[in-house]
Regions:
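General beta-strand structural signal in soluble alpha/beta enzymes
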Residues: 107, 133-136, 157-160, 217, ...
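Rossmann-like adenosine-cofactor binding region
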Residues: 236-303, 308-310
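Generic structural signal for well-ordered, non-membrane alpha-helical segments
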Residues: 27, 31, 38, 42, ...
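Adenosine-phosphate binding glycine-rich loop
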Residues: 160, 180-182, 284-406
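Solvent-exposed alpha-helices and their adjacent loops that cap or buttress functional pockets
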Residues: 57-62, 98-99, 124-126, 150-151, ...
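Glycine-rich phosphate/diphosphate-binding loop of Rossmann-like nucleotide-binding domains
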Residues: 76, 81-101, 159, 163, ...
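N-terminal ligand-binding/catalytic initiation module
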Residues: 1-157, 390-404, 411
Length: 416
């Protein structure tokens, strides 16, 4: 057993099993405390909520509570290992919600026979929570599940594997294009992978200005094109009317490569076929589509991002999902819509262009960081993230009409 594996197991097992717990927010030391907390005092908020359902936000924790829900069919890079095996990941997500955005979470692992069973189960318990984070659900079922739950629930439903990845990728890519002197409207983009993250990334990039006809998506059978007869409805959206069939054909002259597929699928020779000043986001974890050392040896005009923390430009969903929910819940949004996602993209993009505080340098164990090829995305430990992203998302929710209440006074106003 490797040292790191044992350390990871010990971290989860000691001093008590798991990573999260429930803490009390009210005193419970006296008989009177208990009378207020439960019977008979609890009857008063019950009556208030029955009379005015919105009072549930006044008298319970609903407004700060997120459900983290999975069926374990696509756990990290490990695959379909079932609901119970996903529990450490869901607890980890809850830890990140609390650590970075002060949000409480409950992890829920669902065993089900059909996709509709899963949808019905989640929809039945949705009103308990202020928002729902879907996690580690395989494609294409994840698309159907999220769509159905958004339609049935009046709280935010967000599949982070799709949209969190898309938001961080889009923010980093917009900055990389700016540094390389290229425009997203003209960029030729190759996407290796056609699952949940890949499709969401490309759809969001289109909303940022990318042209659908400039995108070449590949799955395990090669280029997704209009003459293929084996495509599901989601891949069909990216079927390109082209005679190109291989990675080598589509990557020749390409400006951008986005990998959300598997390890070692992009070679140094492939990279050399790309246009001048290429951009590579090799996001497969733990091993990227091309190792950064190999990529940087092949091209010295490259901007490279990966999902790894030990190299520059880590594409990490923790840069957005805690803060998107923070902003959405704080205005009681009924959904997380495209305007809110784009607001998060631009908040992240803009933050990376600002001077970096000393505390971030210390946490990242570096002496300096400045906007450039090795710093296109903020660092996860940047304390400004919550305020910037949550505020942008909350404002977008209000302006797009999905917020139930106005922006709180001085909401994350710096210096306010």
């Amino acid at each position: 057993m490797t040292d790191f594996r044992q350390q990871a197991l010990d971290y989860h097992a000691l001093p008590v099993p798991g990573k999260i717990s429930i803490e009390l927010t009210k005193p419970a030391e006296t008989v009177r405390d208990l009378a207020l907390a439960y019977s008979p005092g609890v009857a008063e908020p019950v009556r208030a909520i029955a009379e005015n359902p919105d009072d549930v936000y006044k008298y319970t924790a609903k407004g700060n509570l997120v459900a983290v829900i999975s069926n374990g069919t696509a756990i990290l890079g490990l695959g379909n290992l079932g609901p119970m095996a996903s529990k450490p990941v869901m607890e980890g997500k809850a830890l990140l919600f609390k650590r970075f955005a002060g949000l409480d979470s409950i992890d829920i692992e669902v065993t089900h026979r059909t996709t509709q069973d899963f949808i019905n189960t989640v929809a039945s318990i949705a009103n308990t929570f202020g928002g729902i984070n879907l996690e580690d659900i395989k494609a294409p079922e994840c698309f159907e599940i999220e769509k159905a739950l958004i339609e049935r629930c009046d709280i935010p439903v967000f599949h982070d594997d799709q949209h969190g990845t898309a938001i961080v990728t889009s923010a980093g890519l917009l900055n990389a294009l700016a540094i390389q002197g290229k425009s997203i409207e003209k960029a030729q983009i190759v996407c290796m992978g056609a699952g949940a993250a890949a499709i969401a990334c490309m759809e969001l990039l289109i909303q940022c200005g990318a042209q659908r006809e400039h995108i070449y998506m590949l799955d395990s059978k090669g280029v997704i094109h209009t003459r293929r007869t084996d495509l599901n409805e989601y891949k069909m959206l990216f079927a390109n009317n082209t005679d190109k069939r291989t990675l080598q054909e589509v990557i020749t002259g390409a400006d951008v490569f986005v990998g959300v597929s598997g390890p070692n699928l992009l070679s140094a020779d492939d990279l050399r076929l790309m246009a001048d000043k290429p951009i590579v986001f090799a996001c497969s974890n733990p091993d990227p589509e091309i190792h950064p050392d190999i990529a940087n040896s092949a091209r010295d005009d490259l901007i490279m991002a990966t999902g790894r923390s030990d190299y520059p430009n880590q594409v990490n969903n923790v840069l957005c999902f805690p803060f998107i929910f923070r902003g959405a819940l704080d205005v009681r949004a009924s959904a997380i819509n495209d305007d809110m996602k784009l607001a998060a993209v631009h908040a992240l993009k803009d933050l990376a262009r600002e001077p970096v505080p000393e505390s971030v340098l210390t946490a990242a164990s570096v002496s300096a960081l400045s906007f450039g090829k090795d710093y296109i995305i903020p660092k996860p430990m940047d304390p400004r993230l919550c305020g910037r992203v949550a505020r942008a998302v909350a404002i977008a929710a209000v302006e797009s009409g999905v917020a139930r209440i106005d922006l709180p006074e001085n909401y994350f106003v710096e210096g306010g």
